[in-house]
């Protein structure tokens, strides 16, 4: 790690510069910050990132109710528990009636934003199901984020016209070489990047993200991931620690929960320092590594949390990684618990379309559009 960052006085200067201006850090500086291990140095990093989060978002956290509508997936990613080759998974796909019922329940619990997530399926049947569901959900007034993987631009456009406002498509890593080692040959990094561009053309608020702690991944790779977020001009970021799933080719990868959690938190912090005004989620995977993982994510600079509003029966079947938390907790109780936990760290829940990222609102204002 470069002395220019790790020396205490110099680290203070680097952090002060990052707090003062977005995109002020070089690749080497970001990699060095991501490599910090000393308690005092890491604490200073988190404090700097939180100061930016508070300046941009206040002491508020936006909630997105997470609705996992199916675990059928055409992809075969080597790290994912619902990959198509995993024969031990009991597969399910919710119909429009079930999805609408769960969306209505989420709205009744006070959610005004919903993330609809499933395994990746490209078919006209899937396109129509999502289209119908979006139109039926529309009267609830929910801001809907879709996370349904790679699709054609026409499909993205149809879903946007049916009422979706945000789309999260995680690139998983900005390194094409690393992506190739984590996926079969028929999976295309370039196509995933093009899908992100298509989403922007269709008018979505666009989100992406990566995993932290992948086999063979370096601090420089993660710094490049953050620069990728900037180059793609994304509005929101969802990223979390890599947690091996026992029924995948990467099941035997070494896992130090404490170190993996710390890396995930540092990635949130450095991303906040570099990009300032985007929405950053404290991933549920953080809670899989520590009971207070999501709160620690907020303290490191995140401003979005996504409580699970899927019914318990299906929530147990949607396991992307090991030790998924809150499998048996009813969604209503989960929200109340989260409110109390956020209050304990000085945060309140933000309601309404103010959940849009400041980055998105600024971009729309610059274009003369409505934020």
Where is each model-derived feature located?
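Active-site-proximal loop/turn and secondary-structure-junction residues that shape catalytic pockets
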Residues: 67-71, 120-122, 148-152, 173-175, ...
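Glycine-rich, proline-tolerant flexible connector loops at the mouths of alpha/beta enzymes
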Residues: 64-67, 87, 115-126, 243-254, ...
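Canonical Radical SAM [4Fe-4S] cluster-binding loop centered on the CxxxCxxC motif
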Residues: 58-98
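Conserved, mostly hydrophobic/aromatic
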Residues: 22, 49, 77, 169, ...
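An N-cap/entry alpha-helix motif that binds or orients negatively charged groups
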Residues: 24-61
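Catalytic cores of alpha/beta
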Residues: 152-159, 215-229, 288-299
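Core AdoMet radical
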Residues: 84-101, 106-196, 205-212, 235-238
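Auxiliary Fe-S-binding modules of radical SAM enzymes
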Residues: 1-38, 101, 230, 236-371
